[in-house]
């Protein structure tokens, strides 16, 4: 197989991020300079984002048997790069007061971003597995980065052990699928899984084990038990990456698998996925009700958001609108999560003890940081799916897709889940405007809006509001990103 210049252009984001990893590694070996390495990482990620324009000019193509570059891959690559950029930006002020080595943080984020880009382009079960491992392994280190705090170390050990178990399920499932179908590429799976083949016990067992592995990575019920503890224990910038880049990349590749290989045609698999979606929506929202820790609350709410997305995935066979729904929903979820975790990051720093993640830390925030409180309010309203925010557009799409596919049970679950979610999101929003305590526990720097992290948070809030009122540009971009079969 020969690699042409066109192929290299198609792989530009992957190559640029890979090169940035090497440059940052050499820079760390040469001289430890926090500002320099953070800047190099941000420049590399920005260059990868810009390179997507050239990728678009090259058109859709299968670069290798393992990777397909098309509009779909470009959309998800862009979202992963945006989430990685935000993570690096939030991490800089957070790491300023960190006493141990700061620079490796950026290295690990870049390697995880590389895994996310590989997943966005994956067209084969081998690249799917490689991408998932490449995004998971750096996260073991990132989750435990504040290892002097007991919670962070505990979260890292928990995530490492459970993630390894989930990967073994995923790999065993792939082996069973290969034993039955004789191929691992998504397109060949689609051709080989002809009439009646999907009911073969070996194939059902294989896909069942793969659902266990992928369900863990996406923190779907009942494979979600690690989520709240890891979100709480991980440093705030890492929780940002876990909630956004990791979930978006893995959901993107699952979607492509379902698109090419008609896994959803099997009644048994559809029923299992419907039960998982129903349980994730209801359980995630109910568990979030009692939380007084914002990071745990966002952890449980992410379980319910993935449940909503699963509704659109189950409806994938009924038409293209469900792909549009997933794209719009994920963009809304990305910016809302970046804003919410960004506010937590701005309020936190390792030399002031654990992150500012208790609800009490935000009580009365409006009276001394009004703009920051307004941003947090917008993010909570968007996550709750209130009209005039981008979260509402995404949720409306999911409901429309559910109705179109006659998934009445799941539509009911989405409505009930959204009603429950409204309570705990508004509880966070209301606490920002209560009477401030005499001694405010935690506070953001007075010039937070001029810092890079503050600018990212403000842009996220602006996009959530503007695209919530006028979503047409986003819908057009998502439509362009439909994969060509």
Curated annotation (Swiss-Prot):
The keyword Endoplasmic reticulum does not apply. The chain crosses the membrane at residues 8-28, 35-55, 71-91, 105-125, 127-147, 159-179, 203-223, 235-255, 271-291, 297-317, 326-346, 373-393, 408-430, 455-475. GO terms for molecular function: NADH dehydrogenase (ubiquinone) activity; NADH:ubiquinone reductase (non-electrogenic) activity; quinone binding. It catalyses: a quinone + NADH + 5 H(+)(in) = a quinol + NAD(+) + 4 H(+)(out). It comes from Escherichia coli O1:K1 / APEC. NCBIfam families: NDH_I_N, PRK05777.1-1. This is NADH-quinone oxidoreductase subunit N. Its EC number is 7.1.1.-. It is an enzyme of class 7 (translocase). Keywords: Cell inner membrane, Cell membrane, Membrane, NAD, Quinone, Translocase, Transmembrane, Transmembrane helix, Transport, Ubiquinone. InterPro entries: NADH-Q_OxRdtase_suN/2, ND/Mrp_TM.
């Amino acid at each position: 197989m020969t690699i042409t210049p066109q192929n290299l252009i198609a792989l530009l984001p992957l190559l640029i991020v890979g090169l940035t990893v090497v440059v940052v590694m050499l820079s760390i070996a040469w001289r430890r300079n926090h500002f320099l390495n953070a800047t190099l990482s941000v420049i590399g990620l920005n260059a990868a984002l810009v390179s997507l324009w050239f990728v678009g000019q090259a058109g859709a193509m299968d670069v290798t048997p393992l990777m397909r570059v098309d509009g779909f891959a470009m959309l998800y690559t862009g979202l992963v790069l945006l989430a990685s950029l935000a993570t690096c930006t939030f991490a800089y002020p957070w790491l300023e007061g960190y006493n141990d080595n700061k620079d490796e943080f950026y290295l690990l984020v870049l390697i995880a971003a590389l895994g996310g880009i590989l997943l966005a382009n994956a067209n084969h079960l081998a690249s799917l597995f490689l991408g998932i491992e490449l995004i998971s392994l750096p996260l073991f280190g990132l989750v435990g980065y504040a290892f002097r705090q007991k919670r962070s170390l505990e979260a890292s050990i928990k995530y490492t052990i459970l993630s390894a178990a989930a990967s073994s399920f995923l790999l065993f499932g792939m082996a069973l699928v290969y034993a039955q179908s004789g191929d691992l590429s998504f397109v060949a799976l689609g051709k080989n899984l002809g009439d009646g083949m999907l009911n073969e016990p070996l194939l059902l067992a294989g896909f069942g084990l793969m659902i266990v592995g992928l369900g863990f990575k996406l923190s779907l019920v009942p494979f979600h038990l690690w989520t709240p503890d890891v979100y709480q224990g991980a440093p705030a910038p890492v929780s940002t990456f876990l909630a956004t880049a990791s979930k978006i990349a893995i959901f993107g590749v699952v979607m492509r698998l379902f698109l090419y290989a008609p896994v959803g045609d099997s009644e048994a698999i559809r029923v299992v996925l419907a039960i998982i979606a129903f349980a994730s929506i209801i359980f995630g929202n109910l568990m979030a009700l009692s939380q007084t820790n914002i990071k745990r609350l966002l952890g449980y709410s992410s379980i319910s958001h993935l449940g909503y997305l699963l509704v659109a995935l189950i409806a994938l066979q009924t038409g293209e609108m469900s792909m549009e729904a997933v794209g719009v929903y994920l963009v809304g979820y990305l910016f809302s999560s970046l804003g919410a975790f960004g506010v937590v990051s701005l309020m936190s720093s390792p030399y002031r003890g654990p992150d500012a993640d208790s609800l009490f830390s935000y009580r009365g925030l409006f009276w001394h940081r009004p703009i920051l409180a307004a941003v947090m309010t917008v993010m909570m309203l968007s996550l709750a799916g209130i009209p005039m925010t981008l979260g509402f557009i995404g949720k409306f799409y999911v409901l429309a897709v559910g109705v179109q596919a006659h998934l009445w049970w799941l539509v009911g679950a989405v409505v009930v889940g959204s009603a429950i979610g409204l309570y705990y999101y508004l509880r966070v929003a209301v606490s920002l405007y209560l009477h401030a305590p005499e001694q405010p526990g935690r506070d953001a720097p007075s010039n937070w809006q001029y810092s890079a992290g503050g600018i990212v948070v403000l842009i996220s809030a602006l996009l959530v509001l503007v695209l919530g009122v006028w979503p047409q540009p986003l819908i057009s971009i998502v439509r362009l990103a439909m994969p060509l079969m």
